[in-house]
């Protein structure tokens, strides 16, 4: 029986081939070279985490599990609200079929603010990495559950070639062990199981203490309150990717500021 991730991968691979036929790689690479210099995604998170929390605020219109999340979807306005609310970086969904995202959303968000931006998509091909840079992305996502070790290495190398950072996403101890063979410092612990889309913060509680000290933990999914952040900080998480809970708020700037008000709890005692 196919999972949600299986179905996403199937259509994404078809989409990649269609895009290659429509726009040759050389044209994408020319656009990538002409894009503004990367803004330093990992550097910004590391600086924020040194004194408090690093927040990757996500611009997401819909999801496979929740359907439409936000009807009033003005990307530049949302990006500016996140920036004003204290976000460190942005994550922008560009997948269309499952998340109602679009490449243009990433471009709009990048141009509206000075924050580093993550292209949030299902990346399988170096063509998509060049696309990300051409769109203004400063970081890409590699989902270990959906790629082989050799694919992950190839995608990471391509991102590095374009001066971008990589957020390496894991959901299990096995995936974390595989991720440790990559050079990327950012380890995203997804509290959502991408096969079932069920969410549990216990995933971060379990994996965070197993992440090498030279890596920076980003806890993703299922984060709704300042207490959630304070709780996971006790396990070593200092950075968080939050989308749905902020997207559902009428005043996104105020909601962003409020969730960052969590008192920073020192690691230990668990």
UniProtKB/Swiss-Prot annotation:
Question: Superkingdom of the source?
Answer: Bacteria
According to the UniProt entry, what is the EC number of this protein? Answer: 4.1.1.48
GO MF assignments:
indole-3-glycerol-phosphate synthase activity; phosphoribosylanthranilate isomerase activity
Q: Name one GO biological process term.
A: L-tryptophan biosynthetic process
Please give the catalytic activity noted in the UniProt record. 1-(2-carboxyphenylamino)-1-deoxy-D-ribulose 5-phosphate + H(+) = (1S,2R)-1-C-(indol-3-yl)glycerol 3-phosphate + CO2 + H2O
InterPro entries per record = Aldolase_TIM, Indole-3-glycerol_P_synth, Indole-3-glycerol_P_synth_dom, Indole-3-GlycerolPSynthase_CS, RibuloseP-bd_barrel
According to its UniProt record, in which pathway does this protein act?
A: Amino-acid biosynthesis; L-tryptophan biosynthesis; L-tryptophan from chorismate: step 4/5
By its UniProt entry, which SUPFAM superfamilies does this protein fall under? Answer: Ribulose-phoshate binding barrel
| Lyase recorded as keyword | yes
Q: What class of enzyme is it?
A: lyase
Keyword Membrane assigned: no
Record key words, sorted: Amino-acid biosynthesis, Aromatic amino acid biosynthesis, Decarboxylase, Lyase, Tryptophan biosynthesis
* Family that this chain belongs to: Belongs to the TrpC family.
**Protein name from the UniProt record:** Indole-3-glycerol phosphate synthase
């Amino acid at each position: 029986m196919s999972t949600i991730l299986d179905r996403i991968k199937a259509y994404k691979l078809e989409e990649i081939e269609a895009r290659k036929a429509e726009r040759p790689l050389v044209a994408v690479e020319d656009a990538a070279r002409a894009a503004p210099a990367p803004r330093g995604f990992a550097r910004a998170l590391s600086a924020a985490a040194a004194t408090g929390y690093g927040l990757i605020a996500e611009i997401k219109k819909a999801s496979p599990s929740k359907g439409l999340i936000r009807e009033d979807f003005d990307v530049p306005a949302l990006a500016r609200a996140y920036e004003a609310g204290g976000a460190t970086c942005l994550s922008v969904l560009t997948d269309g079929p499952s998340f109602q995202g679009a490449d243009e959303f990433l471009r709009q968000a990048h141009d509206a603010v000075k924050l580093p931006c993550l292209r949030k998509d299902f990346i399988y091909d170096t063509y998509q990495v060049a696309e990300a840079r051409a769109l203004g992305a400063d970081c890409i996502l590699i989902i270990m559950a959906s790629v082989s070790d050799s694919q992950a290495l190839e995608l990471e190398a391509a991102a590095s070639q374009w001066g971008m950072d990589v957020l390496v996403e894991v959901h299990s101890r096995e995936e974390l062990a595989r991720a440790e063979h990559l050079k990327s410092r950012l380890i995203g612990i997804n509290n959502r199981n991408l096969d079932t889309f069920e969410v549990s913060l216990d995933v971060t509680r379990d994996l965070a203490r197993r992440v090498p000290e030279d890596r920076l933990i980003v806890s993703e999914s299922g984060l709704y309150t300042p207490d959630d952040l304070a709780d996971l900080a006790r396990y070593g998480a200092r950075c968080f990717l939050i989308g749905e809970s902020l997207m559902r708020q009428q005043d996104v700037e105020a909601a962003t500021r409020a969730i960052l008000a969590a008192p920073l709890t020192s690691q230990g005692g668990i």
